[in-house]
């Protein structure tokens, strides 16, 4: 409890955490919880099972509670960026007059846009009608920018209409889409001075104190309009100085800092943010936090964690809601009407409720994207952007929207692009590093070679049903065609899966198949062996987990596997991401995953908490023709076996190439075993019982001691000799000194 309390976690949550036997925070929790409690946006990556859910759930629960408590007591809270009309009382960049990807720091002066393809601009909170005025801009990086002045009528893309005057880093001045050479280029570490003499109608600029001369004469139609400091950025960061701090290059010739301008010269921005700030009025269907998960299983798991963490929170109590498909919408709407504070959901149903106005996003303070790489892979980037655009960037109590992104692969291009677009100066917490296999996991490859193992020819019809990719092909023995070898691979993989279970006497395993039809076929084959969903305790008792199974069945199947009612969970990669299954002794990859990162996710199911685990991958030595649906039905009722490039829904799958990519990714060579699937005993570990902890001190400890014992004894003798020699050398000079 004390460990979590030291990070600022409230006692009620710390008590609940202690009851869960979380004595110390994990690394990801220790790094992320203080950052989120401090109000920052966080990008986090850590291994599955490292406590990522707790890392974002605990601070989200606490801040939502504190927000509700403040509202209950009538407090408005402290603000980092002032809101409403009060924001206009200070010279700063205006959070209510900016582009969608333009971020403003809490001081209102540091600005950033990380959109690499589009320009995003912003204007200040105040403008000027009279006098000679000056402000400075410092460039913090090498991105593109234009700075200058514009009226309230001007586009935020400074210099592209007749109401704005800009000076860009490429050495061009711009007005009304006319770009002319002016001054010189500027970039990182340069300071640009922006001069405005309204009385004479002149605009000019300086670079690092060097006057670049007259840039623009203000046309007559603009002389009665206030001019506001403005900028536009493309993947750049700037910091403004309106005179509150000492200028690097103070102006001359009577120009004064904007912050020193007389009140009679100043005009406040019309964009006060009143329409964009969340209303204090209570809206039952407007949650304070929204957590988006890629699958219903992860959503349910996260909701259960939230229920545990908030166990002792009272007055006010927090109300949570799970919004997922497959559940009657009227039940969810009923809960929404009664009020909700935290929503956890999957994109499909969330999109439905948001688009119909049933779920109001106007009071969201936290947006959490869990397994963001999975969400993007499933094609939900547009949904995320639409949702983010509907959430106010600043709430009524002056708090900024916090965005938290969790991802297995933070450094992927898509995740980086998303973070640049929707996050505000995020802190990266990457404890995952390069993918690696824990030393508690043995992983081996079983080559499936239909040319050397002719078992498939002798089985007749007593084999696993295949996926009908070759329903129209001649796959009879003797055809010697790629289609024949492909069909043979499918048959052999069913046999090898059964053989692996028997050889290792597996009592629990997760079996990964590539497609939903492969899962169904393997389940049917296990039923032919006497097992199946209803055969509790049977050697081949199993359940399926994939998207085509009904929601209640998926939930029930997962629970039955966790409780040990069945031995095998046959699933697609939906179960590889974050589902809370610990200590599974075995994993079988019937087919290698399309993406090399998913290999680590899959085998990460075993070997947790010092328990030994074995992952067996069945890898075809020949290409296998598999389904790859690009049709609108996503495979339902589709029998188009032509190749994708010919307008069909199949591809040739090269597992040997995938294996090579996985080995390169992990920087190791994965051991191969014979088709009998006998795994050789490790030299140090000796006989291993998968699913159980290593012997005390680690399985390899005793073997190492025996080997190193003679060397240690020799080192001890040498150390004794060296110490004795040192003492003699120190003693003799003293004796000689005394003699004289």
From Swiss-Prot:
Covalent link (Glycyl lysine isopeptide (Lys-Gly) (interchain with G-Cter in SUMO2)) residue numbers: 281
PTM statement from Swiss-Prot or TrEMBL: Phosphorylated by ATM kinase; phosphorylation is increased in response to ionizing radiation (IR).
InterPro entries for this protein: B30.2/SPRY, B30.2/SPRY_sf, ConA-like_dom_sf, DEAD/DEAH_box_helicase_dom, Helicase_ATP-bd, Helicase_C-like, P-loop_NTPase, RNA_helicase_DEAD_Q_motif
Residue ranges, annotated region (Necessary for interaction with RELA): 1-525
Biological processes per GO annotation: defense response to virus; double-strand break repair; innate immune response; mRNA processing; positive regulation of canonical NF-kappaB signal transduction; positive regulation of myeloid dendritic cell cytokine production; protein localization to cytoplasmic stress granule; response to exogenous dsRNA
A GO molecular function held by the record: transcription coregulator activity
Domain B30.2/SPRY positions: 70-247
Reaction(s) the record says it catalyses: ATP + H2O = ADP + phosphate + H(+)
SMART domains, A to Z: DEXDc, HELICc, SPRY
Region feature (Interaction with dsRNA): 1-448
EC number(s) per entry: 3.6.4.13
Region (Necessary for interaction with HNRNPK): 1-295, 525-740
Domain Helicase ATP-binding: 2-428
GO-annotated cellular components: cleavage body; cytoplasm; cytoplasmic stress granule; cytosol; mitochondrion; nucleus; ribonucleoprotein complex; tRNA-splicing ligase complex
Record family assignment: Belongs to the DEAD box helicase family. DDX1 subfamily.
Notes concerning its domains: The helicase domain is involved in the stimulation of RELA transcriptional activity.
Subunit structure: Found in a multi-helicase-TICAM1 complex at least composed of DHX36, DDX1, DDX21 and TICAM1; this complex exists in resting cells with or without poly(I:C) RNA ligand stimulation. Interacts with DHX36. Interacts (via B30.2/SPRY domain) with DDX21 (via N-terminus); this interaction serves as bridges to TICAM1. Interacts with FAM98A (via N- and C-terminus). Interacts with PHF5A (via C-terminus). Interacts with MBNL1. Interacts with CSTF2. Interacts with HNRNPK. Interacts with ATM. Interacts with RELA (via C-terminus). Component of the tRNA-splicing ligase complex. Interacts with PQBP1.
Function, as annotated: Acts as an ATP-dependent RNA helicase, able to unwind both RNA-RNA and RNA-DNA duplexes. Possesses 5' single-stranded RNA overhang nuclease activity. Possesses ATPase activity on various RNA, but not DNA polynucleotides. May play a role in RNA clearance at DNA double-strand breaks (DSBs), thereby facilitating the template-guided repair of transcriptionally active regions of the genome. Together with RELA, acts as a coactivator to enhance NF-kappa-B-mediated transcriptional activation. Acts as a positive transcriptional regulator of cyclin CCND2 expression.
Protein name per Swiss-Prot or TrEMBL: ATP-dependent RNA helicase DDX1
Gene coding for it: DDX1
